[in-house]
Amino acid sequence: MIKNIPSHVNQVELLKIISKNYSKAYNFFYLPIDFNKKLNAGYAFINFKSAKLIINFFLELENQPWDLPNCGNKICYLSYARIQGFRSICEHFEKSNIMKQIDDKVKPIIILD
């Protein structure tokens, strides 16, 4: 789980940061949106295909300032999410109303290999 994301950052911007070094490393990504404010909720979920990659991702991003404009002094934090594992995550979100949204930019990204 990625925390303390600046609220104005959108899915595309966050994925650019992640994809610099981890473009093929994950199979699930979701940046929840506050539809009333039209901003992200400040956190995102990512599932890595390999647990080994989490260590590198953690060392690269944990406690680092966001490398994006207008982020002030916000620092990136990482933690484990309540739901773990690709299958469990997919089962959880397939029941979610977010999957009924028309705009793909607000839905979770699920990558099937």
Regions found by a protein language model. Give the residues of each.
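Canonical RRM/RBD RNA-binding surface and closely related RRM-like beta-sheet modules
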Residues: 1-41, 49-74
